[in-house]
A protein has these predicted regions:
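N-terminal presequences and immediately downstream first alpha-helices
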Residues: 1-27
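Nudix hydrolase/Nudix homology domain
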Residues: 1-11, 67, 81-82, 86-88, ...
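Short, solvent-exposed loop/turn elements at beta->coil junctions and helix N-caps
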Residues: 12-15, 126-131
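A short coil-to-beta-strand element that immediately follows conserved catalytic motifs
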Residues: 8, 118-125
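Short loop segments at secondary-structure junctions
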Residues: 30-32, 57-59, 69, 144-149, ...
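Acidic, metal-coordinating catalytic segment for phosphate/diphosphate chemistry
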Residues: 17-60, 68, 78
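Conserved Nudix-box catalytic region and its N-terminal flanking loop in Nudix hydrolases
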Residues: 42-45, 59-109
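Active-site-adjacent beta-strand/loop module that shapes the phosphate/pyrophosphate-binding cleft
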Residues: 18-19, 27-31, 131-151, 163
C-alpha cells in the first residue's frame, strides 16, 4: 500500500555473501508531506522467502510441532532470563524455499524431512514479512491436516524432536505468553479463531 509514493535507490551493493547476504542500500522515499527524504544508508539482511506450516491432527485434536537448536535464539536471549537461555526452540515445521521450488512444494518437502508426514493440499493462511525493519524475509504460512496413516517415514532431515501437543495445551501456552516463535504464535491465534470451521 504505497499509494503511489516514490522511492529512489541511489546505490545497492552486497557487503556479505554466504549462506545469507547483507546488502547496503542508499535510499530516499517520498514522505507523507510530499517531499523526498534525504538519502539514508540502510542494511538489508537478504534471507529469501521461507515457509512454515501448522500441522493439525483433528482426530487426536493435536498439532505437530518440532523442537530444535537454533543458535540465534540463544544469542538473542536476554541475559536476565536464564531459564530461556538454552537455544532450543519449539516451532512449526519451517524452512527456506529452494530455487525453482514453489512455496507449496517447500511445505510438502520440509514436512516430510522434519516429521515424516506426507501431506497433500496445504492451505495458505497468509504471507508476511518477519522483521521488515532489517530483513527481506517473507514467510508463507500454511495449514495442513495430518493423520497417523500419513506418517510414512521417520523424518531424517535434521536433529529434530517431533512433538505432538494437544490443541488445549497450545492454547494454554498462547494464553501464558510462553510461545517464543512468532510463526507459531500467529498460527495458534489463527487456529483458535478457525478451529470450529475445520
Amino acid at each position: 500500500m504505497t499509494g503511489g509514493r516514490r522511492v529512489e535507490i541511489s546505490s545497492q551493493k552486497c557487503l556479505f555473501d554466504d549462506f545469507f547476504k547483507i546488502d547496503e542500500v542508499i535510499v530516499s522515499h517520498q514522505q507523507y508531506d510530499g517531499r523526498m527524504s534525504t538519502d539514508a544508508r540502510r542494511l538489508v539482511f537478504e534471507r529469501g522467502d521461507v515457509i512454515a506450516v501448522l500441522l493439525f491432527d483433528s482426530e487426536a485434536r493435536s498439532v505437530v510441532l518440532v523442537e530444535q537448536f537454533k543458535l540465534p535464539s540463544l544469542i538473542g536471549r536476554r541475559r536476565d532470563d536464564p531459564a530461556t537461555m538454552n537455544g532450543w526452540i519449539t516451532e512449526l515445521v519451517a524452512g527456506m524455499i529452494d530455487a525453482g521450488e514453489t512455496a507449496e512444494e517447500a511445505v510438502i518437502r520440509d514436512t516430510l524431512e522434519e516429521t515424516g508426514y506426507l501431506i497433500r493440499n496445504p492451505r495458505l493462511i497468509g504471507k508476511f514479512f518477519s522483521s521488515p525493519g532489517g530483513s527481506s524475509e517473507r514467510v508463507f504460512l500454511y495449514f495442513a491436516r495430518v493423520t497417523v496413516v500419513q506418517k510414512v517415514e521417520k523424518g531424517v532431515g535434521e536433529d529434530i524432536k517431533v512433538l505432538h501437543i494437544s490443541v488445549d495445551g497450545l492454547f494454554d501456552r498462547l494464553a501464558q505468553g510462553v510461545i517464543d516463535d512468532s510463526k507459531l504464535a500467529i498460527a495458534a491465534y489463527w487456529l483458535q479463531n478457525n478451529i470450529g470451521r475445520l
